[in-house]
Regions:
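The catalytic-center signature of Zn2+-dependent metalloproteases
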Residues: 357-437
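Active-site scaffold of zinc-dependent metalloenzymes
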Residues: 328-367
Length: 437
């Protein structure tokens, strides 16, 4: 058979997307958002085109929003930042026979698994065809570990200018990877001389996921019981144990395995219901309703709770008193009541949760939603909000399905919209976690 000629003009292009009902589960997946994939839990904002939402918020002409917790201000796209992002997603310009070009990008998938384990995931392949090739083949440079089914795409009909072909594929990993594995989509055609020719028209990178790339994070979940002040005759306890599955699936996107220790059962929790000192952390909100405030005098709520928690541990076993000191353990205190703070102007801010600058503590409110805890845990692992200008990349606030956005501010129907992490966030948070033992 004649030798294949490479890099001839393409007449189709192929892109990888998550499975249709993906909600951040099964794997981490990142791609250049172009507004072509409907994310069911984030209607109208999920997959907003990065070209339109990469930029910065300005509080006045030339002055970038300085507060990493706020997205207020005029938003302006940043072409330089977007070009940097295009490089990150490995932009490739495919040339059609008539000289026109189409831009294509590499997608990335992260699969959390252990050595000698086998895992199969489902993805979608999105293809646009101007002229039908002889075949569209999926080839992997690590076929000893990576299996692809089907390895040939079946729908090759011309659809340029119309609806893309969407086909589900299964990728089976027979073991972990110590280096990236590339799945390339190869368009096989016949050139003008009747010779077979091929061109790469799409690419997916499976990121390395062996032991040296997997990390862990030790997290202590602590349920706190407060005095009765919300109309109940008994004090409320925070639910510290009910949301672990979502925490696990989100951190697994970054190849981080959370390792929980819990003080959150009916018998083990931090009881502050009769604690005299805790009364100074009970204030009235803007509606004259009592709530827990994040600061009293010179002591943050988390520091006060930790001091009391250490007393509780010492009473249980003196050897436990200092077990959780330092940053090796992330301590998370869960309250059942509302949590508030005061802004610089004295106005009340309602909090679903917060993390401390020393990356040691997280505090959760009774108003927390599905993604609040892991949002705060990821802050503790070094990730800023997506709309923070000091992040590696900055996105328009409330326009993504990212866990580090404030998308839930759009309304209750978006409470489950924050499901994903970007590849650069995988790398940053993973680098701040602890090696797997």
């Amino acid at each position: 058979m004649p030798e294949l000629r490479k890099y001839v003009p393409a007449e189709c292009f192929v892109e990888f997307r998550p499975k249709a009902d993906w909600k951040g589960n099964y794997y981490g997946f990142d791609w250049m958002r172009e507004g072509d994939f409907d994310i069911s839990v984030a209607p109208g904002i999920g997959d907003s085109s990065f070209k339109e939402i990469i930029g910065k918020h300005y509080v006045s002409p030339g002055v970038v929003q300085p507060d990493g917790n706020k997205y207020k201000g005029d938003f302006k796209p940043d072409t330089g930042l977007f070009k940097s992002l295009e490089t990150f997603y490995e932009r490739t310009d495919l040339v059609f026979n008539d000289g026109t070009t189409v831009t294509n990008y590499t997608a990335f998938v992260n699969v959390y698994m252990k050595e000698k384990e086998t895992k199969t995931i489902e993805l979608q392949v999105r293809s646009i065809v101007r002229k039908s090739p002889e075949s569209l083949e999926l080839r992997c440079d690590r076929s000893d570990i990576v299996g692809i089914s089907p390895s040939n795409l079946s729908d090759l009909g011309v659809n340029y200018g119309g609806k893309p072909h969407m086909q589900t594929i299964k990728i089976t990993l027979k073991d972990t990877l110590d280096n990236p594995a590339d799945i390339k989509v190869v368009s096989v055609t016949v050139d003008k001389d009747g010779l077979p020719a091929e061109n790469i028209v799409g690419k997916l990178t499976i990121c390395p996921n062996n032991k040296s790339n997997r990390k862990k994070k030790a997290i202590v979940l602590i349920s706190v019981k407060t005095p009765s002040f919300s109309g109940l005759w008994f004090g409320k306890r925070g639910d510290a144990a009910g949301n672990k599955d979502f925490i696990v699936q989100t951190l697994h996107q970054a190849l981080i395995d959370p390792q929980f220790e819990e003080y959150a059962s009916f018998f083990t929790y931090l009881d502050l219901s009769d604690d005299p000192g805790f009364k100074s952390y009970i204030k009235e909100d803007a509606h004259q309703r009592k709530a827990v405030v994040n600061w009293s005098g010179s002591t943050g709520l988390e520091k006060y709770c930790y001091a009391k928690f250490k007393e509780y541990l010492k009473d249980m076993d003196p050897a436990l008193e200092n077990k959780y000191n330092g940053n090796d353990y992330l301590k998370a205190f869960y309250f059942g009541e509302n949590l508030i703070a005061y802004d610089r102007d004295g106005s009340v801010i309602y909090l679903n949760g917060y993390s401390t600058a020393d990356h040691e503590f997280v505090v959760m409110s009774g108003t927390a939603i599905q993604s609040t805890a892991v949002h705060e845990f990821l802050h503790a692992l070094g990730l800023p909000h997506t709309f923070h200008a000091k992040g590696d990349y900055c996105y328009r606030g409330l326009y993504t399905e990212n866990v580090l956005d404030y998308t839930h501010h759009l309304g209750d129907e978006f409470n489950n919209a924050r499901i994903s992490l970007y590849k650069w966030q995988w790398t940053k948070s993973n680098g701040n976690a602890q090696p797997e033992p």
